[in-house]
Amino acid sequence: MHITTFSKVQMNPLCPKQEEIRIEDIAHAQSLMTRANGHFPEFYSVGQHSIACAREAIARNYSSRVVLACLLHDGSEAYLSDITRPVKGELSEYRRIEKNMQDAIYVRFLGQIPYDEEMSHITDIDNACLYYEFDHYMGEKLMEQAPLLVTDPAFETLPFAQVEQEFLDLFATLTV
């Protein structure tokens, strides 16, 4: 059982191999995947969200590992898609598969899974960006108190190819 990725790699997403995980596939897929399961009034991609998270980590002066992990934190969605949080919470097997894939991505590009403190920073940034996405697009405040966000992400629809290239360029800068 396999999927065929953008770069024509055939991989089993239930048992990912390091050599099958390619940044080009993640960048391409995320540039085409919408946030909020398509319920925002305009298209805002997972790729744009990931770039915004990485830029926020840079603005907070976090380590290059945390910045790269922020860029990659939704990488599993390139291979598995995503499920909304309320539903995902009920799907323990999916969460296990997603964690396995995400851990494989971290190992592939970071050399290891982020430490607990690093994961805490990644999660904080992810949730802050999510909060401001929903505030901007839906007028909905997901938390009682607005979380810290140092940057000011541009919430706009961008050409897919531009997002893909920006993702790849940022990755290249972070892995020099």
Place the predicted regions along the sequence by residue:
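Metal-dependent phosphohydrolase cores
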Residues: 1-176
